[in-house]
C-alpha cells in the first residue's frame, strides 16, 4: 500500500482541497484517489469476511492499480489482464457460488481466487475504470469462444473486455483464455 495515501486522505478532508485536486490532477489519478478509501474499506471487508489471504489479494490489486498510473494505455491493459489471469483460477459458478449463474464483484472474485469468464471481465473492466479509462472506451462483450483446438467446431458462450482507443478503432481484447491483449482481428477463436 502506498505511503502517500494517508497524507492524501488528510489533505482531502477539506472540500476546497477536494475541488482543487479534481481540477488539477489528471482524471486517472483523481479516480484512484477517490477509490483509495473504497479500496481500503474493501481490504477490511475482505479480511473480515474471507480472511488474510483475501485482504492480501486486495492489497496487491491496489498496488497494481497504483503502479499503473501514468503508464500508457497498452501497458495498463496488459498489466490488468495479466494480474487477473495469473491470480484467478477459472471455475464454474456452480462450484464457486453453488448457483448456475453469478456475476461476482471484483472483491468476491479476488477473495475466492476463482471465477468464470464474466467474473474475470467484470474485475478487469472495474480496474480499468479505477485507473481512469473512460467507460466510453470499454465494453463487456459476449462472444462464442471456440474450444478444443484450432480445428474444433465446438464453441461456448464467453465474455471478454473490449477496449476502444477511439470510437472507430478495432477493439483490443482482454481475455482469460489468452494472456496477450490482442486486436479483435487477431482473435479468430472468438
Question: What are these model-derived regions, one by one?
Answer:
Residues 17-30:
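Bacterial N-terminal signal peptides
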Residues 10-15:
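N-terminal Sec-pathway targeting helices
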Residues 2-5, 9, 27-190:
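A structural boundary/capping signal
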